[in-house]
């Protein structure tokens, strides 16, 4: 039976029917998740192997979301071109701890690593942010689950109240496209299919650990 389901899913993908359904559904709910493995380039030109971001011991350890947020409040935002003279270079969390400076994906990667180390069900997410007072553009953040439900952590916010909020309160402001779970397994959101370049990507089902 399992093999039969796998064959049917393969046929659905090969025929393009599954892809067409995902494109059609993107307008309704960009947060719908699909177990498809996007290429690293879908995250950004500077993205590296996510397994490496979970390797090497961190010098800093924070065990709660609030403690993680408080540490990030002591860090400074800087674009890669200013900080590193590179168009897009993602810092390993260990390097970010030394510099305490970076852009949105550096803040988010460090928060994701800390949450994973603290045994939270956490995902690193890249998509589009459209919040009042800031330009709409590509952005990185983290989602995680705690005892009260699913939360969103946006590390570049400058107060804990805005940095960590229930996902239900802010989901309309964030349009996710691709993500990585606590096992470094990549997946996609329906929001990817709102973009012409996203609709052009053909992906295989994610490999479960």
Residue ranges and their predicted role:
Residues 1-209:
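A structural boundary/capping signal
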């Amino acid at each position: 039976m399992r093999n039969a389901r796998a064959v049917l899913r393969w046929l659905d993908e090969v025929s393009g029917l599954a892809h067409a359904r995902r494109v059609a559904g993107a307008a309704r709910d960009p947060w719908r998740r699909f177990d498809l493995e996007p290429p690293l380039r879908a995250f950004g030109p500077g993205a590296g192997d996510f397994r490496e971001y979970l390797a090497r011991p961190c010098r800093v350890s924070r065990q709660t979301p609030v403690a993680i947020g408080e540490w990030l409040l002591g860090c400074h935002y800087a674009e890669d071109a200013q900080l590193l003279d590179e168009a897009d270079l993602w810092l390993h969390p260990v390097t970010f701890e030394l510099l305490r400076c970076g852009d949105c994906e550096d803040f988010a990667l460090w928060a994701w690593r800390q949450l994973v180390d603290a045994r939270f069900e956490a995902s690193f997410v890249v998509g589009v942010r459209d919040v009042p007072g800031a330009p709409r553009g590509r952005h990185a953040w983290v989602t995680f689950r705690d005892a009260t439900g699913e939360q969103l952590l946006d590390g570049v916010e400058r107060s804990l109240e805005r940095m960590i909020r229930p996902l239900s309160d802010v989901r309309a402001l964030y349009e996710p496209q691709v993500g990585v779970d606590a096992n470094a397994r990549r997946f996609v959101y329906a929001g990817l299919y709102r973009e012409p370049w996203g609709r052009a990507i053909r992906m295989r089902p994610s490999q479960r650990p």
